[in-house]
C-alpha cells in the first residue's frame, strides 16, 4: 500500500439547508449500543468510551439505565465524577422507580420513554393511550419536581397514530419537557415518507425534536438525514451503529452526511472517528469491517487502474471527502486490477 497527499476537495452540488446552528448529537452507544446481543462493556470500557465521546464534542451522552442495578448506577456516578463537558443522561422508562434510580445517581438529566403505538401498549403492557398519557405526565412531573431536566421518547412512533403523538407532544411541551424523541423502533421508515411525516410533526409542534432511527432495513442514516431535512435538530446515534438487532444510525455516517451532503455545520472532532471506532469495536468484541462506511480500513484504498489514475490526478474523482477528516489516509494497492499508473507510481515511491 502507498499513500498519496490530499489536495483540496471540491464541494458537492447538494443544496445546503439554511441554518447556522449545528445539529446536536445524543450518542447512545453506552445504552442502546450495549443492548446489542453479546455486548457487555466493563466499567473501565464505559468510562473510556464516555471520555472519548466527550473529547470529540458529543453534546449529550446517554450513558446507561439507572434502574438496571447498583453496578450500572455506580458507573454512571463515575462518569459524572469526571466532570465531562457533555450532558450525561440516564435512560428511564416512564416509571417512578426509574426516576428515583436516576436521581439517586446525581443525574440532572433524565430521558423518559413511553410506548405510543397501540401494538406496544396493548400487546406488551396491556394498556391503552389514556394510560400512556397519564403515566408519562406523572413521571415528567416527578422528575421536574426533583430538579431534573427531562426529555421524552416516543417508543415505536413509526407505528403510532400521528394525531395521538402530536397531541401528546403538545401537552409535554407545555409541561416544560426539553426535547422530544421520535423513535423508529424497528426501522420501518423510508426517507421520503419520513421527510413528509416528520415535517408535519415539526410544524404542528415546534421545538427541539430528536430522531432515533434503527437500521433493520439499512436506512437508519438515510432516515436520520431526512428527519434533519424535515426540521429535527437532534440526532440519536451510536458508534459504528452498534445497537439492538441491526443497530442504530452510526455517528460517523450521520456526521459526515450532515457536513458534506446537507452542508450543515458539525461541531464534532471528526478526525478522531477512526480511533473512536477502534475503541468501541474492541470493547464490543466485534471486528471492524474493512468496508465500513467512513471508518473502515479499506474505504480510502484503491486498486483499480482507472480509479488510481483518477486519484493521482485529483483524489476527489473517486473520494467524497478528504480521508484526514475522519483520521484516515488514502492508500493505493498493487494487485490484479492495477494499471500502469499504479505501477509507475509505486516504482517512483520506491525509487
UniProtKB/Swiss-Prot annotation:
Molecular function terms, GO-annotated: homocitrate synthase activity
Residues covered by the Pyruvate carboxyltransferase domain: 23-272
Enzyme class: transferase
Pfam families reported in the protein's UniProt record: HCS_D2, HMGL-like
Function: This protein is a Fe-Mo-cofactor biosynthetic component.
Keywords noted in UniProt: Nitrogen fixation, Transferase
GO BP, sorted A to Z: biosynthetic process; carboxylic acid metabolic process; nitrogen fixation
Protein name (database record): Homocitrate synthase
PROSITE patterns documented for this protein: AIPM_HOMOCIT_SYNTH_1, AIPM_HOMOCIT_SYNTH_2, PYR_CT
Enzymatic reactions: acetyl-CoA + 2-oxoglutarate + H2O = (2R)-homocitrate + CoA + H(+)
Domain of life: Bacteria
InterPro entries, per database record: AIPM/Hcit_synth_CS, Aldolase_TIM, LeuA/HCS_post-cat, NifV/FrbC, PYR_CT
EC number: 2.3.3.14
